[in-house]
Amino acid sequence: MKTSLFKSLYFQVLTAIAIGILLGHFYPEIGEQMKPLGDGFVKLIKMIIAPVIFCTVVTGIAGMESMKAVGRTGAVALLYFEIVSTIALIIGLIIVNVVQPGAGMNVDPATLDAKAVEVYADQAKDQGIVAFIMDVIPASVIGAFASGNILQVLLFAVLFGFALHRLGSKGQLIFNVIESFSQVIFGIINMIMRLAPIGAFGAMAFTIGKYGVGTLVQLGQLIICFYITCILFVVLVLGSIAKATGFSIFKFIRYIREELLIVLGTSSSESALPRMLDKMEKLGCRKSVVGLVIPTGYSFNLDGTSIYLTMAAVFIAQATNSQMDIVHQITLLIVLLLSSKGAAGVTGSGFIVLAATLSAVGHLPVAGLALILGIDRFMSEARALTNLVGNGVATIVVAKWVKELDHKKLDDVLNNRAPDGKTHELSS
């Protein structure tokens, strides 16, 4: 039985976003006061992310016949992440050089309000390769869950899954308990998602109310350029990858449309993580693959953020007339290949990584961040949406490469020919 239009989450979130935009535009002061609604919803989602990742990864790994398959999946995923995120960085670099949205602005860095970006610059000082690696190791298991650090929880879950697998039949009771706990957690997710329209309304009303449409007009060329680049990346790059894998990118986008709308409202791809874990498994990807690829992708496969970082850095150089010859741009690309891996899928993280990149490159003024501070919030929607689609496609591709993809189920679900829960024999 089909859900009526008015009862569908897709329609409710879309309506809430539209109402939020109108409220923020016509009554900006009231719109700004709606911020707790958006923040509250995102906090509810973050509350559940750690246990979802733990349960999904542990049951996925412990339930596998061979531990070699887990290592192979991880290696394939990291290889894919590096290739695709590099393509995203290069595309951003090419487009911003061709369009040159910052050319002619002739901004003197000395006149910019450096205090406005001090908080991001300070946070960026902690962004280093060694610091990033050390941060993956939690000081305590409880601390990892309490802080909601995705990579720390993932590391513990992988180790726990390996250990549980080695116990064999002795660990069956623990496995069953975690699997039952997982069902409870996903039940909680279903309850939280009913609040998605309220969260999307609050976040959008606040954004428009605080920053206004005037900010959009002022630096509109960069925003439009970035959005078009993200669309082209999804359609051409991810679309080509999807076609080579045996599915349509447009049908996949339709399949995750509710998650995309939630991300559009909250500007954080992290807000859709729990549902993506569930939906990718229902699409025919083995649980162990989903549990490894999706959480890891939130730090290593942020395609939208990669495009944003190159475009924003070169835009600042163009606007402040800073020298950016081919050597400087190659240096920028190399730095971003490393620094972009530290961006989690949460609102504002891309801006912090950008600050770290400008500091590392040296010849670009960090104060130039003030130029895009006002519009960063509007660009985060495109970043988050591209990140979400990119991680979904990555999961299917990796699942196919390691022969853990149910092709029949994938085809049936995307073409609405079978219920999500129906299973088919795995094909190689």
From Swiss-Prot:
The keyword Transmembrane helix applies. The keyword Transport applies. One of its GO terms (cellular component) is plasma membrane. Coiled coil: none annotated. It is a multi-pass membrane protein. Keywords: Cell inner membrane, Cell membrane, Membrane, Symport, Transmembrane, Transmembrane helix, Transport. One of its GO terms (molecular function) is malate:proton symporter activity. One of its GO terms (biological process) is L-aspartate transmembrane transport. Pfam families: SDF. The chain crosses the membrane at residues 8-28, 44-64, 76-96, 142-162, 184-204, 222-242, 326-346, 352-372. It is found in: Cell inner membrane. Its main location: membrane. Responsible for the transport of dicarboxylates such as succinate, fumarate, and malate from the periplasm across the membrane. Belongs to the dicarboxylate/amino acid:cation symporter (DAACS) (TC 2.A.23) family. This is C4-dicarboxylate transport protein. The lineage of its organism: Bacteria, Pseudomonadati, Pseudomonadota, Gammaproteobacteria, Enterobacterales. The gene is dctA.
